[in-house]
Amino acid sequence: MSQRVRRNGSPTPAGSLGGGAVATAGGPGSRLQPMRATVPFQLKQQQQQQHGSPTRSGGGGGGNNNGGCCGGASGPAGGGGGGGPRTASRSTSPTRGGGNAAARTSPTVATQTGASATSTRGTSPTRSAAPGARGSPPRPPPPPPLLGTVSSPSSSPTHLWTGEVSAAPPPARVRHRRRSPEQSRSSPEKRSPSAPVCKAGDKTRQPSSSPSSIIRRTSSLDTLAAPYLAGHWPRDSHGQAAPCMRDKATQTESAWAEEYSEKKKGSHKRSASWGSTDQLKEIAKLRQQLQRSKHSSRHHRDKERQSPFHGNHAAINQCQAPVPKSALIPVIPITKSTGSRFRNSVEGLNQEIEIIIKETGEKEEQLIPQDIPDGHRAPPPLVQRSSSTRSIDTQTPGGADRGSNNSSRSQSVSPTSFLTISNEGSEESPCSADDLLVDPRDKENGNNSPLPKYATSPKPNNSYMFKREPPEGCERVKVFEECSPKQLHEIPAFYCPDKNKVNFIPKSGSAFCLVSILKPLLPTPDLTLKGSGHSLTVTTGMTTTLLQPIAVASLSTNTEQDRVSRGTSTVMPSASLLPPPEPIEEAEG
């Protein structure tokens, strides 16, 4: 077999073994790690010059596998079955070797089924799991650092991910130069059973299914730099990032997982033009954001759990000993109304409750600072303390206490109580007078903190409580003020315009007076003549048209016909404009 001397001066023997040939290239002392990141860009043009002779095909039944290494040295690969296509590879990115009788233009660790050839770069051993293609390295191989170890053109092994070894898309510039781009670009979705990884799939398939996890495991920048600069890694991992996100979604919240997946996909799309350090920084930022979102979501959950319910249970437990059961009953509906509507008005509730507690006694003032430091749990126990004071008010009602109760009751919503206000206000005058005296004060106090006073103490025994249930506007006082004057003044005001209309009909010269009077027909031409100063056509036409239908309802048919005929005859000589007013009426009508 022929030998070709590469750029680093090491011969690459190509042998046909078992119908296939494995060509390994690389010198013993040719590992130059500093050149790793710059090789794909510096030696790109030198490849084409040094790839003067195509690779040679040995006698075999497999496909032709051309080794186009990024360093500009192409290792010859045998195994072309009698006339297999010989092509000099120009690719700058490693991809996996070809399948049966398929031309491959990029070298990788290839595992071929029938008889095939794999060409690797540098001194790393070729790994072929095919029974037909058995590679004999020129010297004992060093221990491979990774599963898909492929040595770089400067004979320094670049650690590729297994997902990239199995399926690594070439860059866009080289893709058009290749003979079979649809085969060379092997995505994990296009993976066929004849693909080389299927034989050696037991070792390579499991890690290749989740390249992103391997990317996270690799801590060195060298593993990220070479394939990332070649343009593989974002595209390859982006295709398989979704299932990884889904796996996490089963363990975390769906909304959080969706946001994370969107952020992750966006980062992969944008990072194609970035450096590896920027990539790592962005990954770190995403992790920090995820941790923050976890903590924030848990914190909100804890708040939601504690604010409506835990505070209630604590309040009930505190009040079981000193307060009777009658006071505990209203506590449960309190939190439903106040917690839903007035969850944000915690400060106002505290202010109003402090006023009530100052009126009742100093014992409860001592209990207030105990619950105040916990802002979310403070309002429910304070509301219950107000309910306990209400229970005292039910037993010993006083004038000031009634005033405070009236202020709280006037702010709850109940239309039925609104009706009872108007009825009972007339029945019980002293209570309504007290309410009228108290309400302006209550409005001033009630605007600061509505509802919870009323919600805490139902007091069904006292009848005056129902008076204190107007709508949310707290307009109960206005209702009493409006009801009494309307009955005195506004009701005659409603009748007055009606009486004016009735009295206005015989006096004024409108069409309605003709309808109502109709006894003397002499006023009809007078009215038309009077109206002619303003609008002849409309008045005459309206009088004739209104007389016909309305007289039918008021008078007999005989008198109607006579008077209507007379009316038309009298109107005609006085104002002979009946034919023009009719179209004018139509236009105006």
From Swiss-Prot:
Pfam families per UniProt: FAM117
Span list, region Disordered: 1-310, 370-464, 556-589
Modified residues (Phosphoserine): S10, S106, S210, S219, S220, S273, S345, S391, S449, S457
Compositional bias per record (Low complexity), positions renumbered to this chain: 45-56, 108-136, 147-158, 207-220, 404-417
Keyword annotations of the record: Phosphoprotein
Sequence ranges of Pro residues compositional bias: 137-146
Record's compositionally biased regions (Gly residues): 16-29, 57-85
Coiled coil feature spans: none
Membrane spanning residue stretches: none
Extent of Polar residues compositional bias: 384-397
Further remark: ALS2CR13 is mapped in the genomic region covering the complete candidate region for Amyotrophic lateral sclerosis 2 (ALS2).
Name under which the protein is recorded: Protein FAM117B
Organism of this sequence: Homo sapiens (Human)
Species classification: Eukaryota, Metazoa, Chordata, Craniata, Vertebrata
